[in-house]
Amino acid sequence: MTAAIYLVKGREKSVKRKHPWIFSRGISKVEGEPALGETVDVFTHDGKWLAKAAYSPASQIRARIWSFEKEEINKAFFVKRFNNAQLLREDIIERDGLTGYRLIAAESDGMPGVTIDRYQNFFVCQLLSAGAEYNKQAIVDALVECFPDCNVYERSDVAVRKKEGLKETTGVLHGEEPPKSVVIEENGVKISVDIVGGHKTGFYLDQRDSRQQAMKYVKDKEVLNCFSYTGGFGLYALKGGAKRVINADVSQPALDTAKFNAELNEFDISKKRAVFLNADVFKLLREYRDQGTKFDVVIMDPPKFAESKAQLNGACRGYKDINMLAMQILNPGGTLLTYSCSGLMDQVLFQKIIADAAVDANRQVKFVERFEQAADHPTDTAYPEGFYLKGFACKVL
């Protein structure tokens, strides 16, 4: 008999609106002894069936809903999810010429705690919830059925697993170990991805649309690409006809890959055209400001500054300082392309931070375009938390 949870009276409202999370304070009773990640039936306080969910006794999010239908959570269930997700993305894949894309965007694709990115025939999984871990083999078996030639690699080396009572883990789940370099293509740009050692699952696929949109601002411009990682924005800037691109990052291996990516695309990377600079971006911006060095375009794509609500105030200060510095080194009429991937910081707050940075920089700034995560990272209407990446193009006068 399947274990069950019963909700506190009134707490069924969010479930009826199809939100996939049930918090510990919303549960009045647990029937049976569900294991970590085991599937449970969800009932209202008076016994009306609501959903199938994964139980996570160690987490404040005590249950994550797999389905609002009375169906088994097994290989066949995941096959259906994968087929639906692939179908949703077919137009995007064809339009942008993608060999790297997000197949599963967790809750937004009906798979709580499961992220799967595809790089050629390597499918990289992050399993961040107890339910995902419990169903790991069924998830892998379903991937193999849907994509028979696939290799599956796990990158669950993420601290959030501890909140679910899980250890961090990585490794081959099916097929071959990924090579050091897997080359993908997007919008005609080739990019080398290090699946095993790179950030996240290897690359920032969510910024693909923003990279493409950035091209219209860079022709014949001096561009500073901050937190460049393996050069994604820098590659598009070179493709867009930038006069010169400085890629700045604290990681030398990432910069080496950025240079390799530029060569892979046969871009001119003479020192007059492309620079790969190992530097702390905060210090570098202050040095440029103090030296009077100016740019026409500054691209500001920092790592996530806020992992929790307790870190949000500090993150706000960090975003304000770094954008203020960027504004101070822009030529009059220059463009600031700035982004935040912190889900806790909504677009309204981020816009206010940019406005505060403009005051501190003593520059007049106009918002001219807004950006968000790429189209293969959808946001379900019932799960607004799925919208996390936001950005602005700003004209700095």
Swiss-Prot record:
Cellular component aspect of the GO annotation: cytoplasm
Keyword RNA-binding: yes
Gene3D superfamilies: PUA domain, RNA methyltransferase domain (HRMD) like, Vaccinia Virus protein VP39
EC numbers on record: 2.1.1.191
Localization, UniProt: Cytoplasm
Record-annotated PUA domain positions: 2-79
Family: Belongs to the methyltransferase superfamily. RlmI family.
HAMAP family linked: 23SrRNA_methyltr_I (MF_01857)
Name of this protein: Ribosomal RNA large subunit methyltransferase I
Biological source species: Vibrio campbellii (strain ATCC BAA-1116)
